[in-house]
């Protein structure tokens, strides 16, 4: 192909492996008992929190005990995680407790009614003053800002889903271990030497010896799978990324003080340029790309769904249709359920509650000359990310020793 030509993909209006809400969190619980009164519910809380075990073993294919899971921080990711987990069949996880400073009434209400996800199609209610019930599944609620004080040891907690965004280094996350938990999964980029795993990219490297792990960021989970495909098929020399990202709770509703002067400005009124470590973090899961990628974020006035714009120089000459074909092949095989390719002319809201980590917008794939590739990928930065947190927690459970 001539070096001054621009190649743009020609979509055939098909959607490959779209994966919208397969695990929508709207399925009913498979627990073998009905809804009961508050006395029975509290008795069940006592049974759950004092049950022996947590380690999983299998005999003739029957799971003898599930991994006992605590959620620390019941915000956007914490509640999305619970909905995603609730929608899974035969999960190896058992969520038994939530640490939430808002208390039982708030935890129950915000789980049931969500401005983005809609009303949870489950029977959600308080169970006394120290638990909530989700389709008869009783989950204890505790409240303490210091993880060291949490009752993880007494409750036999195997895995903590660390969803506050605060305890992201070894010292902070390690407080859960001090409290008696056996492992911690951080739902944010980890700091220091904490192992980082992105499902579909490097999760096979996880071993039971890891006590604290990170699921990386939502943007890294979107970027890494298709970057892996690009590098394997065409060889990435260098590149830059921009994520046009929905605003988050870290921003201000109206102008107010913030350590980042741009994030101090009203989130719903501005396009806010800010930093992101997502591109550099790809090197944590794909070490051969260290130093080859960088990027920024543009926070925009939408509440959910974001989109990555990646431009890379590649070593192998190519054209847009060939790039999309590589994505389709991976989406149908090793990255099935992680990556998808969409040929429809859609907009951000159409990707709300998408289960996959990233959806390639094939009509926007471009190749300038024959070695500069531009790829656009959509992702639900809450729901899709939370599905991967559940996936990684499942891997922890399945590799339990």
Swiss-Prot record:
Q: Where is the active site?
A: 218 (nucleophile)
Is Signal a UniProt keyword of this protein? no
The impact of changing residue 257 to A is: Reduced affinity for NADP, and slight increase of the affinity for NAD
| GO MF annotation terms | glyceraldehyde-3-phosphate dehydrogenase (NAD+) (phosphorylating) activity; glyceraldehyde-3-phosphate dehydrogenase (NADP+) (phosphorylating) activity; NAD binding; NADP binding
Q: What is its EC number?
A: 1.2.1.13
One of the GO BP terms on file: reductive pentose-phosphate cycle
Q: In which pathway does it act?
A: Carbohydrate biosynthesis; Calvin cycle
Q: What class of enzyme is it?
A: oxidoreductase
Keyword NADP among record annotations: yes
Similarity comment:
Belongs to the glyceraldehyde-3-phosphate dehydrogenase family.
- Its recorded name reads Glyceraldehyde-3-phosphate dehydrogenase A, chloroplastic
Q: From which organism does this entry originate?
A: Spinacia oleracea
Which classification does the entry list for the species? Eukaryota, Viridiplantae, Streptophyta, Embryophyta, Tracheophyta
Q: Which gene encodes it?
A: GAPA
